[in-house]
């Protein structure tokens, strides 16, 4: 069960932030997804046996290297909001032929919702 508010301060604004990330994935340009993330955000997950971890710039670079994912399908599975903190589960199909589950920690910083951390699972 998830808490999915339908007001401007919650779900709708957070969904827009996540959509910026998805739009960047579709365009294949890290710069397009960058506004969704806090400047100090991090990313963690495995690609095969290799840990993909560190500053969010690594994700932007990976996205640039892999190019557009025009066939990408994304669905927000859940959003849970507690005042200035939120978590989001995003299901992604056909990102460069792969399926991912992303888990985001989102924080309201200076009045703006920003992704602080992305942890992902690459489905086999």
Kindly give the residue locations of the regions a language model identified.
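Short beta-strand segments enriched in hydrophobic/aromatic residues
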Residues: 37, 92-94, 119-120
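Surface-exposed, charged secondary-structure patches
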Residues: 6-13, 42-99
């Amino acid at each position: 069960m998830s808490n999915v508010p339908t007001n401007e301060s919650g779900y709708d604004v957070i969904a827009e932030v996540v959509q910026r990330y998805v739009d960047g994935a579709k365009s294949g340009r890290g710069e397009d997804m960058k506004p969704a993330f806090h400047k100090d955000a991090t990313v963690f997950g495995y690609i095969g046996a290799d840990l993909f971890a560190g500053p969010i710039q690594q994700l932007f670079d990976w996205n640039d290297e892999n190019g557009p994912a025009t066939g990408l399908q994304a669905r927000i599975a859940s959003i849970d909001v507690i005042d200035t903190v939120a978590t989001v589960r995003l299901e992604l199909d056909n990102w460069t032929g792969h399926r991912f589950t992303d888990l985001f920690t989102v924080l309201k910083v200076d009045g703006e919702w920003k992704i602080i951390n992305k942890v992902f699972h690459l489905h086999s």
